[in-house]
Amino acid sequence: MGYRQLIDWKAFYAEEAEIELLNDPEEAAARERLLEEISAKVIDYNAHINEYNLAQHCREIQARGLVFKPISKRTALRKWDAFFASELTAETKREICYSSFKWHMFSYEKVAARKGSDAKRAFNRCRKGAAYLFIQCTDEAWYIENAQLLTAADLGVDYSFERADVYIFDAKGKWAYARTHESDCGPYFLRKP
């Protein structure tokens, strides 16, 4: 399960390029209209399937006993910044586009962290109690009472680009884990001394 693509978009865009070469404007307009309808339906279908899969995934996690309490994302962001980014200057944050992607603090090596499979192992092995979780490109954030039941695999599923950058961190700021939308960046794990 995870984020799915139902259509070969490369072939779709090649078809669009072919339409531009047509000498018959009426036929070109008809094909463009049909392609737009196909595109809209496929996007709607993918969104439906991905939302369903996400809901199923959340139910599976909650069935294991995890308790997610919705909180203000602003609260989670303030805590993240205080715990993990307080050493970064405003200039550094601008340079690395920190406000758009908090994980850039790790990828630009402004804050040392484990990465890749090493980060996943470290996250799975660390002692977890209460934690905060937020998603970069949405307004979603939660307080998790029993994060010890959560694994890197639980956080490693893409259901959409908007939900791809996931951050979870200890409620006392002892550790942090960031899963990114970039397949060659991260995930990252930071444990404070």
Where are these regions (language model features)?
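Structured alpha/beta or helical-core interaction and ligand-binding surfaces enriched in interleaved
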Residues: 1-193
